[in-house]
């Protein structure tokens, strides 16, 4: 029986970047140099640094569906997102934290353009709560949530599936496939914990409830691996997923519960492209009509907008809880 959590302060952490900012673009080009072929295709896709307004929807979803959050930390690289359209109450919860702060004592690693490197030290944010929920800015809450949707007295509530990735190991064709890149990040994380690729926990594209003390303990245990992971300025096939490492450690330590209800949906990049008209509308209507859905990830909002021009209107209604069935009819 899952025990309800005694609710401690819970923060949210969101990573954000504006890749078209001239200063950021200049730094990125200096790292990539004239030989982008040295990096994995997954690492240099410009979509990784695109800013398409997702942050606003993510923040609005937290205000409407998780008002109990204590603070919302936005991790930035000498940038400031426009928060002027948000309510005063929501802005009061938000605090920007720069890469220089989370990489304290590791300054030589900067600048970095690698989300995996950044995620490696999110737990190092000064003043962060022991329980924190990590969001990519393309993840949104679409229904009211409670702390008990993320934590129990035993620890974190994880979302994902058990998977066998053993066929991917040492396969150069698969290793070069940008779609499979995330699989290798999870293989590497599981291996660090001594978990076989034949049965590892494949973390879903969701909001990730994290335990800061667990990440600190993992850092103490695997200090060299953490530093190496953070040292890649661009994504690299040798890296591990910090979320996956955290989740496998929690499973092994019995400080995690795997959610038995699929309460999330992932619209991946390329989904619906080339499909018959009405495919995306039907998909969105299915999300509308599924009461269990509490989280939504949209990997490529501009691509989805080209297929369904009213997606921003639909998403605005989805994250605020307004009736939205008519928007997909």
Model-derived features with residue positions:
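Active-site-proximal specificity loops/subdomain of glycosyltransferases
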Residues: 46, 50, 80-128
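A solvent-exposed, charged loop/short amphipathic helix patch at secondary-structure junctions
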Residues: 9, 19-48, 160
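Long, low-complexity C-terminal extensions of enzymes
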Residues: 237, 245-329
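Short beta-strand/loop segment that forms part of the nucleotide-sugar
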Residues: 70-79
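Short, acidic, metal-binding catalytic loop of nucleotide-sugar glycosyltransferases
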Residues: 61-69
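GT-A fold catalytic core of metal-dependent nucleotide-sugar glycosyltransferases
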Residues: 80-81, 121-165
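Long, charge-rich alpha-helical interaction segments
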Residues: 157-233, 237
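Short catalytic/ligand-binding loop motif for oxyanion handling, primarily in non-cytosolic enzymes
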Residues: 20-24, 80-85, 104-105, 140-144, ...
């Amino acid at each position: 029986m899952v025990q309800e959590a005694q609710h401690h302060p819970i923060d949210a952490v969101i990573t954000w970047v504006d890749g078209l900012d001239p200063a950021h673009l200049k730094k990125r080009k200096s790292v990539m140099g004239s030989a982008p072929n040295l990096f994995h295709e997954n690492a240099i896709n410009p979509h990784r640094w695109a800013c398409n307004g997702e942050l606003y929807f993510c923040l609005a979803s937290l205000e409407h569906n998780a008002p109990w959050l204590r603070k919302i930390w936005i991790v930035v690289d000498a940038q400031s997102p426009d928060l002027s359209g948000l309510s005063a109450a929501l802005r009061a919860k938000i605090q920007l934290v720069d890469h220089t702060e989370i990489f304290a004592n590791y300054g030589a690693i900067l600048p970095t353009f690698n989300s995996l490197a950044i995620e490696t030290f999110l737990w190092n944010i000064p003043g962060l709560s022991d329980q924190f929920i990590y969001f990519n800015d393309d993840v949104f809450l679409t229904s009211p949530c409670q702390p008990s949707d993320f934590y129990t007295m035993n620890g974190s509530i994880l979302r994902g599936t058990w998977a066998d990735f053993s066929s991917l190991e040492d396969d150069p064709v698969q290793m070069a496939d940008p779609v499979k890149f995330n699989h290798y990040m999870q293989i590497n994380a599981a291996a660090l914990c001594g978990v076989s690729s034949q049965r590892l926990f494949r973390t879903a594209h969701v909001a990730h409830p994290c335990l800061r003390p667990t990440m600190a303990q993992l850092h103490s245990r695997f200090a060299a691996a953490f530093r190496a992971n953070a040292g890649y300025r661009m994504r690299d096939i040798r890296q591990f997923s910090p979320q996956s490492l955290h989740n496998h450690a929690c499973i092994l330590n019995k400080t995690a519960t795997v959610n038995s209800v699929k309460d999330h949906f992932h619209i991946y990049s390329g989904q619906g492209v080339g499909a018959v008209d009405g495919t995306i509308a039907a998909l969105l209507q299915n999300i509308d009509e599924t009461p269990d859905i509490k989280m939504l990830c949209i990997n490529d909002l501009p691509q989805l907008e080209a297929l369904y021009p009213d997606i921003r209107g639909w998403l605005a209604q989805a994250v605020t809880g307004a009736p939205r069935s008519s928007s997909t009819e």
